[in-house]
Amino acid sequence: MRVRKRQSRRTSTKLKEGIKKKASAHRKKEKKMAKKDVTWRSRSKKDPGIPSNFPYKAKILEEIEAKKMKDLEERELAKQQRLEARKAAKEQGVDAMDEDMIEDDENGLAALVESAQQAAAEYEGTPSNDADVRDDELDVIDYNIDFYGEDVEGESELEKSRKAYDKIFKSVIDASDVILYVLDARDPESTRSRKVEEAVLQSQGKRLILILNKVDLIPPHVLEQWLNYLKSSFPTIPLRASSGAVNGTSFNRKLSQTTTASALLESLKTYSNNSNLKRSIVVGVIGYPNVGKSSVINALLARRGGQSKACPVGNEAGVTTSLREIKIDNKLKILDSPGICFPSENKKRSKVEHEAELALLNALPAKHIVDPYPAVLMLVKRLAKSDEMTESFKKLYEIPPIPANDADTFTKHFLIHVARKRGRLGKGGIPNLASAGLSVLNDWRDGKILGWVLPNTSAAASQQDKQNLSTINTGTKQAPIAANESTIVSEWSKEFDLDGLFSSLDKAIDASKDQDTMME
């Protein structure tokens, strides 16, 4: 049998080009017809809806309808408030737009005024009235001291911080005349260590002031409770070291960065002028990592809204790695220090619980958090204690109805929801709960999640505070302190002239409470 030769598939160029032209003309015609078609086609996928056999369908539909009605009421209420505010401003002769922009442009306008004053002084050849040094002439000294020693393989970040505690803290205490202990306003008690207070009281001639930072993240009534609680032990000053919360919800707007930082700086200068020292006093700043120590120093260095950044800052713990001394003027120096995880006073807590609490205090960088789930679970339990925090939390993450009887089950379903919404998925579309947990902790660190802790005003807690302040554990016996806490607060307040500052801050807090009440 003769095998036939395979027929060639070669075609002429004329035939090939003809096919191409016909195909192109066909596609062009189809595209033109599609444009003329009036039928609307959405590119987004259609919502499949709720299955009819789903047992909670009726309940979910009711909740969706209730949410729509609630959102509509909120929009109408906000519109009515805007109209009333515009009407009131018009009656007073003030433009509503200008009234809203006053606070936002406060720092920028102050900086422009100061720049104009300095330029005029240079042009006229007259010296400036400000005795302080300029921002670009700040005298900054870095002390490169090895606080952590040699790296040990397998040593955790918490163990390194414990090792550096004695060296860093002792260096700051010995070099400082005044200690600014920075606390996180959302949870001051957890960022506070009684051993630090005892060590300062044991050092003769040292003064301790509690700085309640991040006051823009808590409501005025919570701030007022914490101030009353902390003022019974030491002088406490609220401070807003950063420009504002990134979540758009900011409390205590009357306590601006310029107002609080200027008041604190004036108090330090008053103490410096009243002290009989022939040298400049040194103000040491201590606290947990990421509570805002460097931001406090930068706020103090700001000249009427200036943008001095003598200390590097960041939203993650561990930015400051060495002692840094900044000279403000001839009578005042500030000493910045790395964050310290102070030794825990509760020995009954497990290592996992302690690390979860540190993660919730933003004291651990994200790369050192092994398992974020315990910290997220602790956060969920904290937010569940208040309806205001719970509603804000659900609104932020758009949490659907989750059938859960306990916090553990709810947290797992919540992390699955966050992982799917933010694309934190692993192989095969499996939700990555660890990545979702870190994302939630980052939102908490950045202030996107509204949350706070109320002070424990029980009799047992008050008695424990008095006992801690009235005695110092020296290792062998209890050494009494000469003055009680009320005497300490009154005497130190006079030295820093804090009475006028406290009265002005109380008025600002009351004004913030009235403003929040009107917005509600």
UniProtKB/Swiss-Prot annotation:
Signal peptide residue numbers: none
Localisation per UniProt entry: Nucleus
Residue list for modification Phosphoserine: 337
Gene Ontology CC: one annotated term: nucleolus
Disulfide bonds: none
Biased composition (Basic residues): 1-13, 21-34
Chain residues that bind GTP: 213-216, 287-294, 336-339
One GO term of the biological process aspect: protein transport
Biased composition (Basic and acidic residues): 35-48
Taxonomy, superkingdom: Eukaryota
Sequence ranges assigned to domain CP-type G in this UniProt record: 165-343
Entry comment, domain topic: In contrast to other GTP-binding proteins, this family is characterized by a circular permutation of the GTPase motifs described by a G4-G1-G3 pattern.
Family that this chain belongs to: Belongs to the TRAFAC class YlqF/YawG GTPase family.
Protein name: Nuclear GTP-binding protein NUG1
Organism: Saccharomyces cerevisiae (strain ATCC 204508 / S288c)
Lineage: Eukaryota, Fungi, Dikarya, Ascomycota, Saccharomycotina
